[in-house]
Amino acid sequence: MYKTTRLQSVLIQYKWPLFLCLFIPCVYGADDNESWTSVSFEKKLPYSLKLEFEQELRLADQVSTFKQTFSELSLSYKVFDGLSLQIPYRYSTYKDKVKQRLSIGGSYKYSFKPLSLKYRARIQRTFEKNETPEDLIRNKCTIEYKLNKSIKPYVSGELSHSYNEDPVQLDEYRISFGLKVDIMENSSIKIFYIFKKEDLPKSDPDEIGVFGLAYSLKM
């Protein structure tokens, strides 16, 4: 029993540094590195509704220049424990353009402590002046491990593709890992890294690494 407990302790202590080593080739192999920092607020409403607001800043060109900032407002409805529906609206400002995005989606989370699995599906349409609206379907799977009461490491994968093309072609994929830390009863921070490959139909898709920090407050 003691040996088993000790082995688990060693695995917990070293598995994430080892996991980080697996992602080092992704960091150095990326065409560009970006940073994403965000602040979000969450408020529960009557009738199983929830309102969320997020403000994010993104830097590109090896984290040296402004890429975009966006404000996102999302309304979600809890169908039952684990299942919810969401309608997010995003207003994004770039150097030379503005984009608006409307989405509808749902997510389901299943927990079997200390692990939890979450699947999210979303249909989104992006609007830009003088451009044809862009439609995408996004599918994301996340595995989260509850290390203790306040620390939850996770890994996730996401695929995006157009739903009005035949045959269907993947547009982008993302692989990420991170750490969510509850710093107070109603607030948390998330530190993460994302490796994403964009414009997959191109002969030479863009490979981008993202270092991120997010702060969340439940009101």
Q: What are these model-derived regions, one by one?
A:
Residues 47-53, 81-87, 113-117, 149-153, ...:
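Repeated loop/turn-to-beta-strand initiation elements of outer-membrane beta-barrel proteins
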Residues 44, 107-110, 114-161:
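Detector for outer-membrane/organellar transmembrane beta-barrel domains
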Residues 21-28:
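Hydrophobic h-region of N-terminal signal peptides that target proteins for export
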Residues 39-43, 73-77, 104-108, 139-145, ...:
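Residues on the lipid-exposed face of transmembrane beta-strands in outer-membrane beta-barrel proteins
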Residues 155, 166-219:
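Predominantly the C-terminal beta-signal and adjacent terminal strand-loop region
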Residues 55-61, 89-95, 110-112, 123-127, ...:
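Transmembrane beta-strands of outer-membrane beta-barrel pores
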Residues 29-86:
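Start-of-domain marker
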Residues 33-35, 67-71, 98-102, 133-137, ...:
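Residues that define the transmembrane beta-barrel architecture of outer-membrane proteins
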